[in-house]
């Protein structure tokens, strides 16, 4: 089978590999229908994910059809269409029992697929701990509707949940990339008083304006003044930082009102400064909103009910045979790209 593979720093290639086989009674084999490219895949390509193993098939955003299951797999069976969770988790340790599956203590736990073991930009993938890692897609939900459930949409849903958004809040979302838009969609479910999106790209601001016309828009240079002019208490009640740029962490806490919650969803390439003397007296609560795949079943239900739709994010579609081209477009942000669906021919 064809598999897009991490050869070495700066080099991914589509190569031939053997179809995976079950290695444990808790495994499942999934025939990949659709996969997608994530910025984390680019981090692997650039060598900034030390735990990534050269030789692995990359990709952790995927949906597919269950081909085979181990004897201890529950909840799914061959023939089921499923989402695949980016996180591998046991469901039994302290963190899993408390809903923090991102911090699973199993040796297999955490980000394994497409990082430490073969992932989904291929034709077939082995999913460890499949009872927890697979969710059946409802019959009236398409593969494209479900494509982002296991990663970028799970991130946005978790971030909105831990931000404790109320209907009286002004919510500021910094960044309108794929994760930022998924975070926006999930924040909208909370029905806050207003949502402001800060994004430097005119192209992406126009995307938000087209699809979410009730959202207020600003740029990083104008954000501080804009938020103060469009909030009730001298700043945003909830700030969700999804950009991860050099200046956006500082912008996030500066735009927050006193006693606000600032949720950091973004990953940073370098250390950030927490200037406590500058923010003394603001009494801010900081939270981090990394991927936590504990809500995938609920997210699928919301998609089924028509309350979440991420299909507008799919701006491009490519067969697996042209995945090099897809990566070039995604990495260089060409042609208005937001997300790319990779399908098997």
Put a short name on every predicted segment.
Residues 163, 205-285:
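Glycine-rich cofactor phosphate-binding loops and adjacent beta1-alpha1 units
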């Amino acid at each position: 089978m064809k598999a897009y593979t991490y050869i070495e720093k700066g080099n991914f290639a589509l190569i031939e590999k053997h179809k995976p086989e079950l290695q444990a009674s808790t495994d499942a084999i999934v025939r990949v229908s659709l996969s997608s490219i994530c910025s984390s895949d680019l981090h692997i390509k650039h060598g900034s994910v030390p735990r990534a193993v050269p030789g692995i098939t990359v990709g952790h955003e995927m949906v597919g059809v269950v081909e085979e299951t181990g004897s201890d797999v529950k909840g799914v069976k061959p023939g089921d269409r499923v989402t695949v969770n980016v996180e591998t988790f046991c469901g039994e340790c302290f963190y899993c029992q408390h809903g923090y599956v991102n911090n699973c203590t199993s040796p297999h736990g955490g980000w394994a697929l497409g990082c430490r073991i073969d992932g989904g930009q291929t034709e077939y993938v082995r999913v460890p701990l499949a009872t927890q890692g697979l969710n059946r897609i409802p019959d009236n939900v398409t593969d494209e509707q479900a494509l982002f459930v296991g990663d970028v949409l799970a991130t946005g849903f978790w971030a909105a949940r831990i931000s404790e958004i109320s209907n009286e809040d002004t919510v500021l979302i910094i960044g309108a990339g794929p994760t930022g838009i998924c975070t926006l969609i999930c924040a909208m479910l909370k029905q806050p008083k207003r949502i402001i999106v800060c994004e430097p790209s005119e192209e992406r601001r126009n995307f938000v304006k087209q699809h979410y016309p009730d959202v207020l828009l600003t740029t990083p240079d104008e954000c501080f003044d804009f938020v103060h002019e469009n909030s009730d208490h001298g700043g945003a009640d909830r700030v969700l930082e999804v950009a991860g740029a050099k200046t956006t962490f500082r912008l996030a806490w500066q735009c927050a009102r006193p006693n606000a919650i600032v949720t950091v969803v973004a990953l940073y390439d370098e250390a950030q400064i927490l200037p406590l003397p500058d923010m003394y007296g603001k009494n801010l609560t900081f939270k981090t909103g990394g991927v936590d795949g504990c809500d995938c079943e609920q997210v699928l239900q919301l998609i089924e009910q028509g309350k979440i739709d991420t299909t507008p994010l799919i701006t491009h579609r490519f067969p697996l045979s042209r995945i090099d081209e897809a990566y070039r477009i995604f990495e260089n942000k060409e042609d208005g790209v937001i997300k790319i669906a990779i399908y098997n021919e």
